Amino acid sequence: MKENVYNPLTGKTNLYYDEQEERLKIRIPERANIAMDTVGRFARGARAGHPALIFEEDDGTLKRYSYAELDGLSDRLARGLRGLGVGPGEPVAVHTGQRPETAIAHLAIHKLGAVVMTLSQLYGPDTVAHCLDDSGTRTIITESSVWAPHRDARGRYTSLEHCIVTGGATGDERAFEECLVSDETPLESASTGSEDPALLMYTSGSTGLPKGLLHGHRIVHAYLPTLTLCYNLELDYPDAVFWTPADWAWVGGWLDTVLPAWQHGQTVVASAHRFDAEWAFNFMARHRVTHSFMTPTALKRLAEVSRPRERWDLAIRVICTGGESLPGDVIRWAEDELGIVCNEFYGLTEFNHMAGNCKALFPIVPGSMGLTYPGRRVAIVDDQGNEQPDDVVGEIASWRDDDPSLFLGYWGDPGVPERMMLGGWLRSGDLALREASGYFRYQGRNDDLIKSSGYRIGPAEVEDALVRHGSVAEAAVVAKPDPDRGAVVMAYVRAMPGIETGEPLARELQDYVKKNLAMYKYPRVVEFVDAYPLTSSGKISRRTLRARAAGEAE
């Protein structure tokens, strides 16, 4: 457990974790089920009546669900889904935001041994069509307002048979409430193994369309020790209240916030309200939020608000953060202005929590990614897989060694792809260096993948969307450094002959990508070009374009 973990004071093997050794062991049971290992664990005991979820509507109306109530509603939905033929191993799409129905759907699908496929509300018809068709998904659970732009595209979703809608079904859609089947007989949850597929998340890569990444039921057990550190050893803090503004379709929102809270019988509060810093402070004060996961982008927004402790009676104790690099001044702001702990961690959707912080055990160095977390072997390697000495920039990598937090593979392609391996190392695609103290410092991406505000954006899918617009002959998309978001999408566009370029066309292309891919994937910067710089092999030189974009950002 202590291999490659350093004591920043002595430079030797880290002793900080020793006193927590039992607590931080990764324990993977042979049989596991996310629903039964979280809400189901407390639904029939002394904690059954404790609030598991409190949802605040936009008008301030509150909906409260105890552990027993949430468990019972998920039983009813599971029966309804089973009546539609949903069975073990089958993907069911959940295309909803922070709502009670999202939680109920996740639990119900897991109880059937089926696979939850998370779809962000931000996805446009092109992305949704790809995800549904690639996975062969027959059933989707969505919101009427979210589904509205997809109704006209329904014919493109060739595998889809059942559309379950909250907030008003039309045509052949089924109302969510009608799928809640009552039965006095207790539902017997499917007996799933720890490595059986449980979660399917489509993530962007540096090339091609998004790929369906699979995690097994073991993931909640594999994450628990490292999340214990992220939350500063306070996952079991008495009557804690957890909240995240992050989308529940992503790892940060669901796996890093909701599920660990429910593994400890805690309360989660939620809202579909669009994030706004002033609103967020009001929300946290109103619900006495004690623990939160936020992206660095959200934290930067909070840091722009003056005198928060004077203006709000806050209960917040710990904020953990990840997904992009966090500026050191934001950590200092959290400590000085809020009087709280802000623990940053580093990881990928494929294999998470490689390194991070835990102020309860060791000092936080602002601007660093923290130390290697227990149960991990992390190094900086060169392009041959050789470990690099301290203070040398290389690719951050994790030793495979049957890490239970590792994803199962991609949909239809089990196992870790060869391109991600370098000897026994799992490649991250991120550049970093490790200081002599053992702390890692992020240096940037090693490929074309764009990381903006914590989102992963593949340039190829944005380029494909732009080229489908009739005014575009060719497009090249790169990351443009941005002090607020880490990076933004920048598109170098060559227009069709005779097309007038300028601001009106740039806005039209931005709106086109927003509509067809996702709001967060549109190019915030569009530059029209007559030609592209080329490599010796005649390919577009993305390295040159990235350098140009970086130069323009200065």
Language model features: what each stretch is:
Residues 263-266, 289-294, 303-364, 377:
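Gly/Ser/Thr-rich phosphate-binding loop
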Residues 221-244, 248-291, 305:
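Conserved AMP-binding/adenylation subdomain of ANL enzymes
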Residues 49, 53-107, 124-129, 177:
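Conserved AMP-binding/adenylate-forming core of the ANL superfamily
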Residues 123-130, 140-143, 292-295, 398, ...:
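AMP-binding/adenylate-forming catalytic core of the ANL superfamily
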Residues 63-68, 198-225:
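Conserved AMP-binding A3 loop
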Residues 79, 83, 107, 111-178, ...:
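Structural core segment of the AMP-binding/adenylate-forming
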Residues 49-51, 171, 181-202, 209, ...:
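Conserved pre-ATP/AMP-binding loop-to-beta segment of ANL
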Residues 71-76, 213-234, 299-303:
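Conserved structural elements of the adenylate-forming
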